[in-house]
């Protein structure tokens, strides 16, 4: 819940940057998971949820524009 509030304060450009960072993080976590080195599997779900929230906000801001 706190993260969506943090994301809502950002503009479209910052959200796009945040989305790229989250996608990179998701890729790294998936690689760790595939190699069996992932110590905190809950992070995959958290990152996926954050990606969905950022994409929703980008779409929302696009519709308002």
Curated annotation (Swiss-Prot):
Family assignment from sequence similarity: Belongs to the universal ribosomal protein uL29 family.
Organism encoding this protein: Buchnera aphidicola subsp. Schizaphis graminum (strain Sg)
InterPro entries, sorted: Ribosomal_protein_uL29, Ribosomal_uL29, Ribosomal_uL29_CS, Ribosomal_uL29_sf
Residues passing through the membrane, by range: none
Gene name per UniProt: rpmC
Keywords assigned by UniProt, alphabetized: Ribonucleoprotein, Ribosomal protein
Gene3D superfamilies: 6.10.140.1970
HAMAP family recorded: Ribosomal_uL29
GO CC terms: cytosolic large ribosomal subunit
GO molecular function: structural constituent of ribosome
GO biological process, one term: translation
Protein name: Large ribosomal subunit protein uL29
